[in-house]
Amino acid sequence: MYIKQVIIQGFRSYRDQTIVDPFSSKHNVIVGRNGSGKSNFFYAIQFVLSDEFSHLRPEQRLALLHEGTGPRVISAFVEIIFDNSDNRLPIDKEEVSLRRVIGAKKDQYFLDKKMVTKNDVMNLLESAGFSRSNPYYIVKQGKINQMATAPDSQRLKLLREVAGTRVYDERKEESISLMKETEGKREKINELLKYIEERLHTLEEEKEELAQYQKWDKMRRALEYTIYNQELNETRAKLDELSAKRETSGEKSRQLRDAQQDARDKMEDIERQVRELKTKISAMKEEKEQLSAERQEQIKQRTKLELKAKDLQDELAGNSEQRKRLLKERQKLLEKIEEKQKELAETEPKFNSVKEKEERGIARLAQATQERTDLYAKQGRGSQFTSKEERDKWIKKELKSLDQAINDKKRQIAAIHKDLEDTEANKEKNLEQYNKLDQDLNEVKARVEELDRKYYEVKNKKDELQSERNYLWREENAEQQALAAKREDLEKKQQLLRAATGKAILNGIDSINKVLDHFRRKGINQHVQNGYHGIVMNNFECEPAFYTCVEVTAGNRLFYHIVDSDEVSTKILMEFNKMNLPGEVTFLPLNKLDVRDTAYPETNDAIPMISKLRYNPRFDKAFKHVFGKTLICRSMEVSTQLARAFTMDCITLEGDQVSHRGALTGGYYDTRKSRLELQKDVRKAEEELGELEAKLNENLRRNIERINNEIDQLMNQMQQIETQQRKFKASRDSTLSEMKMLKEKRQQSEKTFMPKQRSLQSLEASLHAMESTRESLKAELGTDLPSQLSLEDQKRVDALNDEIRQLQQKNRQLLNERIKLEGIITRVETYLNENLRKRLDQVEQELNELRETEGGTVLTATTSQLEAINKRVKDTMARSEDLDNSIDKTEAGIKELQKSMERWKNMEKEHMDAINHDTKELEKMTNRQGMLLKKKEECMKKIRELGSLPQEAFEKYQTLSLKQLFRKLEQCNTELKKYSHVNKKALDQFVNFSEQKEKLIKRQEELDRGYKSIMELMNVLELRKYEAIQLTFKQVSKNFSEVFQKLVPGAKATLVMKKGDVEGSQSQDEGEGSGESERGSGSQSSVPSVDQFTGVGIRVSFTGKQGEMREMQQLSGGQKSLVALALIFAIQKCDPAPFYLFDEIDQALDAQHRKAVSDMIMELAVHAQFITTTFRPELLESADKSSGKSE
């Protein structure tokens, strides 16, 4: 083992962390100038290892901290790393670090970074070979000089430290202290024995009078015992009688409380029934209000439908009359039209004949006029043209123009002909289209009527379903109110259960549920969810008669949480703490419960509690853990007997417990606050609530949902029908619009037909005139150019003039006649088209509309709706009447329940008054019992105070009455007054002092033996100390001579033990080996004393001659230092350490002696590590490793 590395920070001159290079296991030399920090390095190692720095005050710790410029150092540490490859330190590591940290308010040791105490460090170093009695493995600067100049007594002190006499001295001091304490005790015992002897002599004289006193006192105590015993027996009899009365009263009170509880249960049941009935009434009244509102709405709808049906019926009746009237009017219109058409048929041929004659006359007039014009033009061309050729040229040009004009006329005539033909064809086509549209219109009307009928059928069905849904809604509302009442009742029961349970436990249960909900939401830890089974109370059932004893037995264990394993509970608790949830939870992990089978006593007076519980066998361990060692007993007496005999907990049905350890607990238990009863009520309420919710969901809501779906389907059908209706009505309107448009087109074409015909006639007449002119011009072409008309042409002109006059006159006559006929035709046609036919169309349209209404679709649908609404009104009124009857019956039931409530209240009050009366009586009996118990205690106390009595005292006076006893007692007291001055405790004191004397004598003998043992121990210690000094002196003296000869070859040195008497009046010197023959010479006892040694002298001869031996005072400074070094080496060889630290031990030596010291260190470094500081070269030569220090 050796120092491998030193780390220093903040210590003295070392501000920053300084790591000293790894040291060699042999000789290490540190060189440096003065003030470079060599000594502080040694101080740092001493700071960790030496006792010198063991108890530092705050100011001393601050003095060790580095002081310099810059920030203040608040802590420092020195760490030494040891090479422990030889396992010299009892630590199984090759490297061991020891650090000491100091600050203004701390001083701590760390071994391998773990904090340890100073004593642990010192013990560890001692186990490695560091001796507290030999501090010379560290030699500080100046220590050599100090030893060189030290007196002999100081060297003797050093020798005693090396020999380890400190331990002997410490034990001797302890022995002296014990001896002084023992001596003091012996003196006190002697004083007490002297006092007791004197007191016993006095008490011997008082014993005679005391005998007489004791005689009468014995009689007095016997009499008093008899009196007290009789009073005690009388009191016990009264107490037994009172206990019987209390038991009877208690039984009666229990019966009254049970009756009172039954009354309260009945009242609570009645209150619950009243609440339910009131809720039912509220629901029925609310339903009645809804029915009333529905009935008002239904009556309103019925009134509307009745009015609508009446209007429709009136309309149908009126339509029948109107139809008759319209048909009659239509017939008249048809007759008039036929008459007018007949008139028109008679007039049109005349008109056509006159018109044809007129057209022919006009055509002939135009032709004759054109011919005459041509003849006059022919006559005029004689003067117009100068020559025949010029005329022919003009004629040709004119013929060309005429041909073009004739062609244009022909084209116009052909176009008009085509137009007239098209008009006629369009007229036929229009008529066909009109007939086709009329047929389509009839089909659309039939389809619309069918859709109307279907629409009203679907609507009636929808109204019926809505009425059924309204009824179901009312039912659902009633069920919802019942559900709300049940939920409120459940919340009240849960609140009562919460009030009977601790807040911390409830918070714990809620928190566990939150953790499990968190797992479920996250979908994690499924095995934890499956492994949690709820609290104990929710996992078993039992008869109500056992509720009290079961609940008292389990206590808060009812709320322990059952889990499959400790892993499940750990997972839950980890999440519980992670979520920082409140509450208190206790788990029962089934895999960790160690439950053994219990042998129950076979008796008819007790049964195992666990046999009365019903639970899942899977949780058998949990229930055996809680209830397995408890018996239900018939009475407290049975409980007490069985608890003692079978070491089991016993309990009565009333909850009175007897622990197997002997403790008794019991008293009145309020069953109204039974948590099991409350839990049963909560569970029952939850089941009823679940049944109501299931009923609501399965029946009503499912039917409502079904009806809603059907209504939605019917609404969709109605929408589809309405869409089809709109489509067909739009088609009907479009068809009517097309028919009207076709009719208007036909009338328009008829209006334009006659003008086109007249235009055609005019164009044809004009064409004939133009053709006649063209023929005339062609005939003239090539003829001679006349100057005047020929005779024939003149005749023709005259004839044409006569014809034109006749035609004009005839045409005027025809025109007048045509105008007259045309006026008749126009008037007749106007009357037909604008009056008769238009009115006929209106009549036909009204008849069509009447035919649509006469279909009865609307009236049928309205009648059907009216029947349905009447049925709903009837049903609503019937339901309302039923509700009125139910409300009356329910209110009557409430009144009956309230009467019953009053009866039970009165009964409960009577029971309460009886209980209060019994309670007062019980209090009186309790007070009396207390007084009797007090009297009993007083009697028993007085009997105890009488002390021990002879056997005859218990029987001698038993036959006497109290009066006789008191008379004898009075006589005794009179006699006892004569001995009032007697020390009544003389005998007791005599006995007491005698016993004390014996004890003190025994104690004195023990102290004498102890004193002798201490003296023997001190002699042994003194002998061992003497032997240790002698042995150490021999070893050191021998080592000193050998080391000195090696340091100074040929020289001689010896140690001399100096002696003297104890007083110090004489002294003598003893050389090496003479001490043992002189043992004990300086002591008057048989045990030699070390006090005879006065010092250790040194005698040396540097020449080796015996005659030149000199004392230390006669040596030079260098010689003294060398001798001191030799002594240190001798001490170290006597008590070797793992390593040594020398701080400038060679500063006073010359070069030759420094070389000798270096060789000595080199020799010793084979078995131990040396760390030395120097600024001389000699030590460096033998160093295995050297390093420099600089500031």
UniProtKB/Swiss-Prot annotation:
Q: Which UniProt keywords apply?
A: Acetylation, ATP-binding, Cell cycle, Cell division, Centromere, Chromosome, Coiled coil, DNA damage, DNA repair, Meiosis, Mitosis, Nucleotide-binding, Nucleus, Phosphoprotein, Ubl conjugation
Q: Kindly list the biological process annotations in GO that this record carries.
A: cell division; DNA repair; meiotic cell cycle; mitotic sister chromatid cohesion; mitotic spindle assembly; regulation of DNA replication; sister chromatid cohesion; stem cell population maintenance
N6-acetyllysine modification sites are K105, K106, K140
Q: Where in the cell is it found?
A: Nucleus; Chromosome; Chromosome, Centromere
Q: Where is the SMC hinge domain?
A: 530-642
Query: Record keywords: DNA repair included?
Result: yes
Q: Which GO terms describe its cellular component?
A: basement membrane; chromatin; chromosome, centromeric region; cohesin complex; lateral element; meiotic cohesin complex; mitotic cohesin complex; mitotic spindle pole
The residues that hold ATP are G32, R33, N34, G35, S36, G37, K38, S39
- Quote the Gene3D superfamilies the UniProt record gives: 1.10.287.1490, 1.20.1060.20, 3.30.70.1620, P-loop containing nucleotide triphosphate hydrolases
Tell me the residues on which Phosphothreonine occurs. Answer: T783
Q: Which domain of life is it from?
A: Eukaryota
Q: In which tissues is it expressed?
A: Ubiquitous.
InterPro entries referenced in this protein's UniProt entry, alphabetically = P-loop_NTPase, RecF/RecN/SMC_N, SMC, SMC3_ABC_euk, SMC_hinge, SMC_hinge_sf
Region Disordered, as annotated, extends over: 242-268, 1059-1090
Cite the post-translational modification comment.
Answer: Phosphorylated at Ser-1083 in a SPO11-dependent manner.
MF terms from GO for this chain are: ATP binding; ATP hydrolysis activity; beta-tubulin binding; chromatin binding; cis-regulatory region sequence-specific DNA binding; double-stranded DNA binding; dynein complex binding; mediator complex binding
Coiled-coil stretches noted in the UniProt entry, renumbered to this chain: 173-357, 389-504, 668-1022
The family classification in the record reads: Belongs to the SMC family. SMC3 subfamily.
Note what the entry says on domains.
The flexible SMC hinge domain, which separates the large intramolecular coiled coil regions, allows the heterotypic interaction with the corresponding domain of SMC1A or SMC1B, forming a V-shaped heterodimer. The two heads of the heterodimer are then connected by different ends of the cleavable RAD21 protein, forming a ring structure.
Tell me the subunit arrangement. Forms a heterodimer with SMC1A or SMC1B in cohesin complexes. Cohesin complexes are composed of the SMC1 (SMC1A or meiosis-specific SMC1B) and SMC3 heterodimer attached via their SMC hinge domain, RAD21 which link them, and one STAG protein (STAG1, STAG2 or STAG3), which interacts with RAD21. Also found in meiosis-specific cohesin complexes. Found in a complex with SMC1A, CDCA5 and RAD21, PDS5A/SCC-112 and PDS5B/APRIN. Interacts with MXI1, MXD3 and MXD4.
What is known about what this protein does?
A: Central component of cohesin, a complex required for chromosome cohesion during the cell cycle. The cohesin complex may form a large proteinaceous ring within which sister chromatids can be trapped. At anaphase, the complex is cleaved and dissociates from chromatin, allowing sister chromatids to segregate. Cohesion is coupled to DNA replication and is involved in DNA repair. The cohesin complex also plays an important role in spindle pole assembly during mitosis and in chromosomes movement.
Protein name as annotated: Structural maintenance of chromosomes protein 3
Origin species: Rattus norvegicus
